[in-house]
């Protein structure tokens, strides 16, 4: 089981500083969509240039022109790139092909997908590396969690890894870990903690069953 730190609300310098503080406890560091909107792909490059021994994910949330956008993210140092599960099949297939020919990985974000079971099966057959169930900020505010969606997707896929994101914190991560996802994505639960290093350490301990 892997742990990913999602960083959304910092500038690229502070993001790299935070990532380096917690890198002993995480496998993947994400440059979140808000940072990419604010600072562009150079934020991904800054992270890739300033951290070692962890993968860098660019949360592009691609919807179209997929092979080009994947290739650009890779050019700027991304190891993992995200595309939306609601994108056209042709876009997702092109994104997977572009990532794989560069020995990189593609994560498909299931935010706003209505028929999770059907789409997860399709994405699994397409060869997505990760299928991520994601309760976004707006639904978290309504009290929703990704647990049920995680169970649904895990029950139908055969090859892809299952990732889970959405309001996960050190004090709630054990409920998620109990469902055995392949990748647990924690954002504010680490980034906004009073002691991010301790929060990351607690999350790592939870996924290792300690």
From Swiss-Prot:
The keyword rRNA-binding does not apply. Keywords: Carbohydrate metabolism, Lyase, One-carbon metabolism. It comes from the Bacteria. GO terms for biological process: 'de novo' pyrimidine nucleobase biosynthetic process; formaldehyde assimilation via ribulose monophosphate cycle; L-ascorbic acid catabolic process; one-carbon metabolic process. It catalyses: D-ribulose 5-phosphate + formaldehyde = D-arabino-hex-3-ulose 6-phosphate. Pathway: One-carbon metabolism; formaldehyde assimilation via RuMP pathway; D-fructose 6-phosphate from D-ribulose 5-phosphate and formaldehyde: step 1/2. SUPFAM superfamilies: Ribulose-phoshate binding barrel. InterPro entries: 3-hexulose-6-phosphate_synth (IPR017553), Aldolase_TIM (IPR013785), HPS/KGPDC (IPR041710), OMPdeCOase_dom (IPR001754), RibuloseP-bd_barrel (IPR011060). Its EC number is 4.1.2.43. GO terms for molecular function: 3-dehydro-L-gulonate-6-phosphate decarboxylase activity; hexulose-6-phosphate synthase activity; orotidine-5'-phosphate decarboxylase activity. Coiled coil: none annotated. PANTHER family: 3-KETO-L-GULONATE-6-PHOSPHATE DECARBOXYLASE SGBH-RELATED (PTHR35039:SF3). Belongs to the HPS/KGPDC family. HPS subfamily. This is 3-hexulose-6-phosphate synthase.
